[in-house]
Structure formats: C-alpha cells, structure tokens
From Swiss-Prot:
<keyword id="KW-1003">Cell membrane</keyword>
<keyword id="KW-0472">Membrane</keyword>
<dbReference type="GO" id="GO:0043022">
    <property type="term" value="F:ribosome binding"/>
</dbReference>
<dbReference type="GO" id="GO:0005886">
    <property type="term" value="C:plasma membrane"/>
</dbReference>
<dbReference type="Pfam" id="PF03144">
    <property type="entry name" value="GTP_EFTU_D2"/>
</dbReference>
<feature type="binding site">
    <location>
        <begin position="134"/>
        <end position="137"/>
    </location>
    <ligand>
        <name>GTP</name>
    </ligand>
</feature>
<dbReference type="InterPro" id="IPR035647">
    <property type="entry name" value="EFG_III/V"/>
</dbReference>
<feature type="binding site">
    <location>
        <begin position="17"/>
        <end position="22"/>
    </location>
    <ligand>
        <name>GTP</name>
    </ligand>
</feature>
<dbReference type="GO" id="GO:0003746">
    <property type="term" value="F:translation elongation factor activity"/>
</dbReference>
<dbReference type="GO" id="GO:0045727">
    <property type="term" value="P:positive regulation of translation"/>
</dbReference>
<keyword id="KW-0648">Protein biosynthesis</keyword>
<keyword id="KW-0378">Hydrolase</keyword>
<dbReference type="InterPro" id="IPR038363">
    <property type="entry name" value="LepA_C_sf"/>
</dbReference>
<dbReference type="InterPro" id="IPR027417">
    <property type="entry name" value="P-loop_NTPase"/>
</dbReference>
<dbReference type="InterPro" id="IPR031157">
    <property type="entry name" value="G_TR_CS"/>
</dbReference>
<dbReference type="InterPro" id="IPR005225">
    <property type="entry name" value="Small_GTP-bd"/>
</dbReference>
<dbReference type="GO" id="GO:0005525">
    <property type="term" value="F:GTP binding"/>
</dbReference>
C-alpha cells in the first residue's frame, strides 16, 4: 500500500487537438510504462473512433510509479478525461477524483471555449491547476500572449508556465516534477469506513461491469461485500486491481488510491458514474456530493433499411447501452419507415458517435430521422408532458402552452468575425447576454439560444462564418415558453410522421416552404403525380408537386379517328388516378436528411 503523501492524483484538461493524449503518451514513455514495442500514438484512446477523430470519449486511468529528483518514489495516478462538452458530467466526476490538474493549452492557439468550461469545473472542485504551454517547437507559437490570456481569462498565475512540446518530449520531465512538487497529496483515513467515488464504468463480456473508482476513506479488499449508495444493492468484489496501463491485480487498495474492481455486476446501472461505494457491513451516511442521473437531451429515430434487420439492430443497441448509460432507446413504429427505435443522446457529438459505431462495429444499415430536443407541453388540466417526438404532440385543444430548452452559448472568436457571429446568433433567436474582450484581438460572446436552433447546422455555420477560428461551449440552462407549432408534411394527402417537426411560429412558413422544395428535389418522379404539402393543423402553408412521367399512349395511332386517341388518353388518365390512390411513393434516405437542411435556402 502506498503512503498517502507519496500519491498524486491528477487529470489533464485541454481543448480538442491541444495535445492531451500526446502528453499522456510521452509521460507513459518517459516513466517506462510503455515499452518501445508497444508504443503507439494515443495509447489511452482504445476505441477505433477515438483514434480516428483524435478525441477522448471514455475516461481511462494509469498508475505510474515515478522516482523524482528528490530521490523519493511517488505514485502518480493519471485520470484521462473526455474533452467534449457532451461528456461534461463524466469530466466533472473524473475531476472530482483528482486533487490537481494540468491545464494544457496550445501555444499557437490560446485559450479555447471548452478548455475554459473544464477549468471552471476543476476550480469548482478546488483543484490545484498547473498551466502547461504545449507545441512550443512550432514557429507560430506565442507563449507570452497565451500566458497573458491564461492570467486574464482564468486568473491563474502564469508567470512561470511549463513550456513543453508533447510531440518531441521537450521538457516533459519538468511536468512530472511539477506534479510531484505543485499538486497536493490526497487527504483521507485508511482506517475509516470505506467511501469511494465511481468515476467511470464499462461492460466486459467476461467479467461483467468493470468499475473505475477513487477511494476517499477506508480500505477495500478482494472478497469484500460492497454496497452501491444510490441503489442500496450489494455485491462481492471478485477482482481488484490497478491499470499500469494494462490491468494488474491487487489484494487491497486504501484511501487516496485509484483502481478498478469487478463484482459480478450485470449492467451499468448497478454502478452509476458519480455514485459512492461503501462496505455493506459498515455503510457511510454521507455519500459523495454531486451525483446525478444523466438525462438524454437529443432524440432521433433509428430505423433499419431492411425490416429483417430489426432484431440485429436491437441487439446492437443493447450492446452499446451496456457501455453507455447516457444512451437510451425504446421501440417505436412509423407509418413511413416501419419498426425502429427512438434513441436518446447527451448531445450531437454523442449522437454521431453512436450512429458511426452502429455502422462500423455492427455493420448496421440505418435510416436516421432528424434529431429533436425534449419539449415540455402543459395541458389545460395542469399536467406537464415531456415530448421527445413531434408525433407525440397533443391536440391543439388540450394544449395550454409549450416550453423549449434554452442553452447558454459561450463563443470565443477573433475580433474580425464578431459581426458575423452576432448575425448568426440573432438568426437563431438568440438573446445576447455578454460580450467581453480577452485581448485586443479575441472576444468572448455569451448568448442564450433555444437548444433546437443549434441542433442542425449551427456548428457548421459558425465554423464557416469564422473560417474555423471560433470555438464554442454550451450548457442547457432552463425551459422557457415559446410560440411553437407542429409542422406536418403530407405526401399525396397522407401525413408522413418522420418529416414532422416542431418549429417557432415565425419561422414555420419559410421552414415549410424550404422543406417542401427540398423534398421535391429528393423524391424521384414516378408514373403518377406526387403532391407535397406542408401544413400547420389543417392549414396548408406550402405546396409542391413532382410531375409524373408521361408515356405517349397515342404513338401507335397512325391517322384515323380522333375519338380513338381520346379514348386511349382517357384510359391513361383513369389509370394514373388509380395509381395515385393505390401507389406507394418511394422515399429515399436523402429525403429524410432534407429535414436537417430545411430553412437554408
């Protein structure tokens, strides 16, 4: 067992692409945790998608023995955290398991929005923060400016920042010395009752659920009967150990240490992230604060292209859910698409990742409907319904009011693009709250915007308006009443539920027109006329028609009586009428994606 004063638990905070995983790689190499043979980039990002997108999705830990310059042996526990805003709850739990954090900032870029969000999370947990300027070997590096930014924006003393290059390994030794010297040792009593924080968990097909935890007080041994605080369920610890970075078994772990355990748990809900582990024989009364159940905020329908693929898709979704409690799904049926699932996600990146994993790991062929947020409908009898699908919207007569989620956007942008960003936020029904200059050339703009407005193309538009220089962070703040209506799309007078959307009344007409036009372009011509209508209730607000193919039925008539030709044309007309009544309109996948791009024209 390690002595408390020789342990350092730390996280690395960084914006995407500022070099967090690369710094972790160098630390593992310098301390000899990864041999030359095993060496590879992004060592801790095990998932193929993490490697490819260059992002960290799941938290990982590594126990690193390190002999410092003072001759003492220290145990450094690196707790690797996701950096993206969708996974902010995981980040807050990982930070709660640490005493300190390395703030890695790209010296060519400066402080970005998501870095800032995670730094403030770290400060909320009273973490000691060490600023590290990365990529100093690049010619465009400007350490003085970035150090000044860190001091002004975050309020950290940055008079002597660590200047490193994680890629080449320059000065990474100094980072390890700084962890030992500047970060505090954990507090805790190994003899007190057990109290440990779960900061991540995943499902292993051999061992069941693997739980990553940090012990605050007490000691845990293999064979102990543990209790999960929020559920009250008890389990026997079958495996206990630490990651170095490969799993290594241990007989016992004590206060201040970070490790993993398996206890024959069958599903992730048995060990929710942020929960407290105690001993069943001696449970603690006060659990670790800040535990919350993660709620999905974005919903969309996922349908198999072939009806026969329904069961394999269900099995794939169940497997993904084993590793991701924030992801939820339930069966639903659509008149247009048949049987499928309504899936809930933390945010847009989370949705993209799940869809990509389904296609990649399970070879699923999917039709995805447009994502929607959760609305709150207040009925005349006072009841409040949560609506995650436009087709569940109650009738107008029963409805008293509709509320939608609002989020606070914090956009970091160079001075030259402020006008373009303000215009974009105003278009999205945003309310400006604040605008302050970090430096003479960089601005932070704060807006409150309906979450539904940033769902589809806000990120893309923001990047294109600012030539890729803007960075963004958002958090959902509250629900507000809005003048919202349900827009239906009718194809040959039949409503198609997959195209329904809830939109603001002011933008309903342009949105409906744009969507009808996009569908007209996406739906191929057929032997009969296709009429596309956009409607609010019974009022048609836009109409487009796809003209039918025309077969020349009179081609075989050479001269002769006009009545013969007329008879053939009448017969064709009758046939087309019957076809229109009976015929099914084939709607391609591109048409479902048209909903996402509606309103752009």
């Amino acid at each position: 067992m390690a002595k408390l004063d020789k342990i350092r638990n730390f996280s690395i905070i960084a914006h995407i692409d500022h070099g967090k995983s690369t710094l972790a790689d160098r630390i593992l190499e310098i301390t000899g945790m990864v041999s030359e043979r095993e060496k590879k980039d992004q060592y801790l990002d095990k998932m193929e998608l993490e490697q490819e997108r260059g992002i960290t999705i799941k938290a990982q830990t590594v126990r690193i023995p390190y002999k410092a310059n003072d001759g003492e042996e220290y145990i450094l526990n690196l707790i690797d955290t996701p950096g993206h805003v969708d996974f902010s709850y995981e980040v807050s739990r990982s930070l709660a398991a640490s005493e300190g954090a390395l703030l890695v900032v790209d010296s060519t870029q400066g402080v970005e929005a998501q870095t800032l969000a995670n730094v403030f999370l770290a400060l909320d947990h009273d973490l000691e923060i060490v600023p590290v300027l990365n990529k100093v070997d690049l010619p465009s590096s400007d350490c003085e400016r970035v150090a000044q930014e860190i001091e002004e924006v975050i309020g950290l003393d940055c008079s002597e920042p660590l200047m490193i290059s994680a890629k080449t390994g320059l000065n990474v030794e100094d980072v390890l010395e700084s962890i030992v010297k500047d970060l505090p040792a954990p507090q805790g009593d190994p003899d007190a009752p057990l109290k440990a924080l779960i900061f991540d968990s995943w499902y292993d097909s051999y061992q069941g659920v693997v739980v990553l935890f940090r012990i605050l007080d007490g000691t845990i041994k293999k064979g102990d009967k543990i209790q999960i605080h929020s559920t009250g369920r008890t389990f026997d610890v079958t495996t206990l150990g630490v990651y170095t970075p490969e799993p290594q078994k241990a007989k016992e772990l004590a206060a201040g240490e970070v490790g993993f355990l398996c206890a024959s748990m069958k599903e992730l809900n048995d060990a929710p992230v942020g929960d407290t582990i105690t001993l069943a024989a001696d449970p603690v009364e006060d659990p670790f604060p800040g535990f919350q159940e993660v709620k999905p905020m974005v919903f969309c329908g996922l349908y198999p292209v072939e009806p026969a693929e329904y069961e394999p898709l269900k099995a794939a979704l169940e497997k993904l859910q084993l590793n991701d409690t924030a992801f939820s799904f339930e069966p639903e049926t659509s008149t247009a698409l048949g049987f499928g699932f309504r899936c809930g996600f933390l945010g847009l990146l989370h949705m993209e990742i799940i869809q990509e994993r389904l296609e990649r790991e399970f070879q699923a062929k999917l039709i995805a409907t447009a994502p929607s947020v959760v609305y709150q409908a207040r009925l005349n009898n006072g009841e409040v319904l949560e609506i995650d699908n436009p087709s569940k919207m109650p009738d107008g007569g029963d409805l008293e009011s509709l509320a939608e989620p609002f989020c606070r956007l914090e956009i970091h942008v160079p001075n030259d693009y402020v006008g373009a960003v303000l215009k974009l936020c105003e278009e999205k029904r945003g309310i400006q709250k604040d605008m302050r200059y970090l430096t003479s050339s960089r601005v932070i703009i704060t807006y409150e915007v309906p979450f539904a407005e940033i769902m589809y193309d806000f990120f893309d538009k923001l990047k294109s308006h600012t030539k890729g220089y803007a960075s963004l962070d958002y958090e959902i703040i509250d629900y507000r009443e809005s003048n919202l209506v349900k827009l239906d799309i009718l194809i040959n007078t039949d409503p198609v539920d997959a195209f329904s959307a809830i939109v603001h009344k002011d933008s309903a007409y342009p949105f409906g027109r744009s969507l009808a036009l996009k569908l007209k372009r996406a739906i191929p011509r057929q032997m009969f006329e296709i009429v596309i209508q956009a409607a609010i209730g019974r009022k048609i607000i836009a109409k487009e028609r796809v003209a039918p193919f025309r077969k020349n039925v009179t081609a075989k008539c050479y001269g002769g009586d006009i009545t013969r030709k007329r008879k053939l044309l009448e017969k064709q007309k009758e046939g087309k009428k019957r076809m229109k009544k009976m015929g099914n309109v084939e709607i391609p996948q591109e048409a479902f994606m048209a909903v996402l791009k509606a309103g752009e024209d």
